[in-house]
Amino acid sequence: LIYASNKSMIAKLKGDKDSYYLSFDEIPQSVKDAMVVTEDRDFYKHEGVNFWSTAKAAVMLVESKLRHKDISRGGSTITQQLAKNVFLSNERTYERKVREIFIALDLEKKYTKDQILEFYINNIYFANGYYGIEAASRGYFNKPAKDLDLAEAVFLCSIPNRPSFYNPLEHYQNTLKRKNRILKQMLDEDCISAAEYSDANYEKIVLKPAQAIKTQN
């Protein structure tokens, strides 16, 4: 994947989200920690692809084809997810997975880990037409991401894994349960203290949703 300039690739990664695009420093630390902990704990260690996880995902893809069931989950790093979300379709084929790997490796050569995480958090889908953490924060809580507390931030970070299943407007309890699981992961990884975990775990999440842009799985 070759672009004429670094600027042109960044434009592609930002897409039409500039109005709600946050720089790395503007993204709350709780959001960055939650995304890494739940989506790709080795994000700052690998070079774009976790080949062991990818191999397991490939086996699951084969099984899903043979059984005609959707059982293929996971295996993609944050960089791979970014490659798929921005440059590829959601089809589950071997060809797409190979392209995803090569694009991810290319992204890792061109950008720092912090830049990739910034692109990812600004591009990931949060259900109900909201792309990126700023749009999600304004859409679900009617406030900018910088004003999210820990529980609210992690609640939002629970959605992208399966946007339809964790859609908080339709499956609030699913989102809440995942929020609590992610908080425990953050505690185990020393991202938060025991007191912060306890407070966020028991905090009541009150949504103040704006009108959704559109519904999309």
Question: For each of these PLM feature ranges, what is it?
Answer:
Residues 1-217:
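Juxtamembrane regions of bacterial inner-membrane/periplasmic proteins
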